[in-house]
């Protein structure tokens, strides 16, 4: 559903590093030949690439990263896009909903469940964490609209934390 939405929205590129927390999303990307997957050498490069692509073309692309340290590596690029009002979508992996808060799969802050989105709250327009597949169409539309709404005071980045369950 994520890949299908991005293709319908006109996204032609996604950039990131494959990892255990984002495999299912990456597998879906590979099913869409119109979606070019760019594998970068560092997650920060994916976020900067998404930011730079929007600056050069006026078209948003998605950056993706796995759980924990991989997601944390995107912060500087996402913050740069946020400060300069550039549209980009960040997709990160997240543990199964029933595993949140159990320090599994490189959760960053063991005191809080599904905690990486807390890191991006201050550097994105909004953070979404769908917990069921049925929520994806609604969440993707909201994330895209929040990111690209030109009636808003400023464009910005959106972050989706995608659970294994989704």
Where are these regions (language model features)?
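N-terminal alpha/beta PP-like core and its mobile active-site loop of ThDP/TPP-dependent enzymes
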Residues: 1-158, 163
């Amino acid at each position: 559903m994520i890949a299908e939405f991005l293709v319908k929205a006109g996204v032609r590129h996604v950039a990131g590093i494959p990892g255990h927390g984002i495999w299912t999303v990456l597998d879906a990307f590979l099913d869409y030949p119109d979606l070019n997957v760019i594998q970068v050498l560092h997650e920060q490069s994916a976020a900067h690439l998404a930011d730079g692509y929007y600056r050069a073309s006026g078209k948003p692309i998605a950056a993706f990263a796995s759980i924990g340290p991989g997601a944390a590596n995107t912060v500087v690029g996402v913050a740069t896009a946020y400060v300069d009002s550039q549209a980009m979508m960040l997709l990160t992996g997240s543990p199964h909903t029933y595993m949140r808060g159990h320090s599994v799969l490189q959760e960053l802050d063991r005191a809080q469940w599904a905690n990486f989105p807390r890191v991006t709250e201050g550097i994105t327009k909004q953070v979404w964490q769908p917990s069921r597949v049925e929520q994806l169409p609604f969440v993707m539309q909201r994330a895209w609209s929040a990111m690209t709404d030109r009636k808003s005071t400023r464009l910005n980045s959106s972050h989706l934390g995608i659970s294994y369950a989704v």
